[in-house]
Amino acid sequence: QLLTVFTDITCSEIKPDVTQEQIEALPEFFIQTASALKDDSYNKWEKEFRIREYCPYSSADEWADKLMTRKYGDLDNPTGIYVNEGDEVVVLVGNTHGQSISIQNIGEETSKGYAQTSVNGDIYPLKEGVNKLTAKQTGMLFVMYNTNIQNPDAQPIKIHIPLGGGKVCGFFSLKEHQTNEKYKELIDKADYKYFCVIGNAIILYFHHKQLKAAVPYDILSSIELWDNMIQWQQELMGIEDVYPKQMNNHIFAISPEGGYMWASEGRIGFVYTVLGDILRKSYLMASRNCLLYTSDAADDRISV
């Protein structure tokens, strides 16, 4: 019945000759989405994060073993949609190309008396077509699509989380959004406790309020700072030929509400009171005496 109105099972586009009568014959849940698509009233910001193609990422566990390092993060595909406990969410999945895919709900955990982002959460396997899940806790939804990225079948997978399922918070992706102006627009709209910034090599999953106070506008210099440091580390390790052709996971950074700075399996932590320190290159170089890797058109050099 859905395919009498929509062009495919993700229900992200409707057929051009669809009538209102056909829309009203749909199951009640899908009428709102079909109507919004037909009359072009689907909020552009909501639509950007509810209808997306998710790219494949390597297995962080597998590559930690191969490279004999600690594990990179595996939360490489944030949806920009969060849920509250008890929320029911419909997830519409397109062609999976024979790949395994799931959604993970990442909430908070308590460590040594303070809150921090959990390293993992409830996982809901997905299949092609209509999937329904009920959230057991408040958290951000991440698509888990980890596979051999050199496999020809490791293709992007289209997913639609229709209106009424969770709430859009959004995220900033360097690859997609590119400008400081877009970052400001997105972080200003966000209303969840955490906000996600995706660089080429690092993901910053930090407290929204503290991140916005630390970097109200110039996020590009912050991303460049950390992407460059990770690139330098990879060159020192001799894995620059592996990353990102064979292994493409990000370093995943969180902002615990206690402790200080640390690195562990799957994530690194910076207590949320120091975000203004670690996201400003000038401060790191002047006050932290940090050794930084910088690149420019003329040369690659180490700066102190």
Question: Where do the model's predicted regions map?
Answer:
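Juxtacatalytic substrate-recognition/specificity segment
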Residues: 187, 192-295
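Low-complexity, Pro/Ser/Thr- and charge-rich linker/hinge segments at domain boundaries
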Residues: 160-196
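A signal for specific C-terminal beta-sheet/loop modules enriched in small/flexible residues
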Residues: 113-125, 162-174, 212-236
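Short amphipathic alpha-helical surface micro-motifs
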Residues: 71-74, 123-126, 179-180, 185-188, ...
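Single conserved hydrophobic/aromatic residue that forms the stacking wall/gate
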Residues: 293-304
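Beta-strand-enriched, solvent-exposed domains that form extended recognition/catalytic surfaces
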Residues: 4-170
